[in-house]
């Protein structure tokens, strides 16, 4: 957190310099150069370089608001509590997947401390209020008469869904404390494990990896997650409750201990997951929420006027 704190004030300067480089390189007309010289793809390389620099300049500009908040987000000076939601994209919902499990973690001056890790039904079991199911639930789930927390991500606008979810979640007897919500789907652990390689998870035998599993012709971690999460509760109750937290913990620990050469890959995973809505953020604090929206990480729907 202290290192980030030193970096944050430099972001404006770094962004301005990168913008100057982008402006300069964008003036280069690649069509004035031959396609190849001695077997080297000159024109194609220039085009790719221009696109890369332009993308970096744009990304850094979008990241500035959130980077300036990073010390605070990493628990400096005060600890920050995060609620992780797992969206199972094999069962589609408006925000990206069925809300299957949740976990909590606390970050204090950059140090991550795991909290609880539970099945989403644990949260619902503590929610005793009878809220009539809205029309979409009644239409597609006719035997569900009440609106459960697990079904409250009805709006494709993530903030709207989380406003609803958190409003009612407060009434659950087991509602966790949080400063922010981070929702991920199966694509996030797959991408991270492609960089990390197979990792162990405390309390579970074997390894979790992104390698293809012939049982599903999909990444092994997806098979294991869905196998554990979708089994009937009476068969594997403890597994359902605990898989998300330990898996995320193990991945975070392995990422933090990775060589610096891999950090760029993790950064790319983070940015691509945000761009493709595999990772979504929701903050209680308005300034942090606005920063997440500027980054494109808040899953907001944008209304365009005619002519835009």
Feature locations, PLM:
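Non-catalytic, solvent-exposed segments at the cell envelope interface
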Residues: 1-308
């Amino acid at each position: 957190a202290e290192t980030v704190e030193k970096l944050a004030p430099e972001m404006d300067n770094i962004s301005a310099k990168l913008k100057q480089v982008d402006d300069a390189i964008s003036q280069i007309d690649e069509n004035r150069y031959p396609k190849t010289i001695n077997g080297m793809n000159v024109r194609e390389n220039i085009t790719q370089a221009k696109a890369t620099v332009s993308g970096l300049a744009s990304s850094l500009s979008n990241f500035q608001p959130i980077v300036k908040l990073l010390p605070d987000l990493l628990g400096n000076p005060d600890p920050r509590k995060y609620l992780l939601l797992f969206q199972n994209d094999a069962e589609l919902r408006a925000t990206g997947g069925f809300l299957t499990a949740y976990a909590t973690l606390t970050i204090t001056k950059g140090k991550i401390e795991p909290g609880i890790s539970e099945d989403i039904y644990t949260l619902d079991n503590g929610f005793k209020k009878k809220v009539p199911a809205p029309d979409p639930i009644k239409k597609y789930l006719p035997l569900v008469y009440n609106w459960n927390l697990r079904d409250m991500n009805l709006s494709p606008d993530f903030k709207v869904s989380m406003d609803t979810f958190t409003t009612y979640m407060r009434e659950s007897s087991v509602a966790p404390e949080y400063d922010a919500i981070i929702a991920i789907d199966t694509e996030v652990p797959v991408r991270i494990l492609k960089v990390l390689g197979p990792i162990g998870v405390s309390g579970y035998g074997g390894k979790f990896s992104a390698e293809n599993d012939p049982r599903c012709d999909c990444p092994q971690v997806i098979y294991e997650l869905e196998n554990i999460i979708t089994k009937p509760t009476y068969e594997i109750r403890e597994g359902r409750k605990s898989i998300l937290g330990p898996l995320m913990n193990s991945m975070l620990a392995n990422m933090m201990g990775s060589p610096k050469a891999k950090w760029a890959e993790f950064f790319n995973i983070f940015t691509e997951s945000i761009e493709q809505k595999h990772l979504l953020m929701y903050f209680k604090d308005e300034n942090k929420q606005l920063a997440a929206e500027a980054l494109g990480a808040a899953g907001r729907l944008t209304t365009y006027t005619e002519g835009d």
